[in-house]
Amino acid sequence: MPILAECTEPLAEGVIDMRGLWQGISGRSGFLERIEQCGNRVVVTGHNLIHDFRLDGTLRNGARDVGPACENFNSAILFKDEVMTFRLFNLFDTVSRRIDGENMIFTFVDGVETRAKRICKYPKE
């Protein structure tokens, strides 16, 4: 069951609809993630983690992740020029997602781009 299944708030102004299940078709092998959006809240599930954050560019409402060695990562996330960008400790860009036609381009901090296709969307009702 999606985390934001009960949310009916429209997407925030200027936010591109990335909702759905995305599967990599080039770039990093095994890429698969689900993106949920409601208002300015986003939940990304994949890669053995769940990001739950607001698109307000603050660390307070950003993604807080814990790595395998218990290291903490805190990212501010913003949506600008149709690109969702994760900024580690709000110091530098680490990950971005953008729509390119029918695909999503996921770019990691090392510059590797993964092109993903949306294999399903959430039903309207």
Residue ranges of predicted features:
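Amphipathic/hydrophobic helical signal segments and adjacent flexible N-terminal regions
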Residues: 1-44, 48, 60-61, 65, ...
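Short, exposed beta-strand-loop hairpins at the edges of beta-sheets
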Residues: 103-111
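A short, structured loop/turn motif at beta-sheet edges
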Residues: 37-40, 78-83, 98-103, 121-124
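Generic detector of short, aliphatic-rich beta-strand segments that form the cores of beta-sheets
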Residues: 115-117
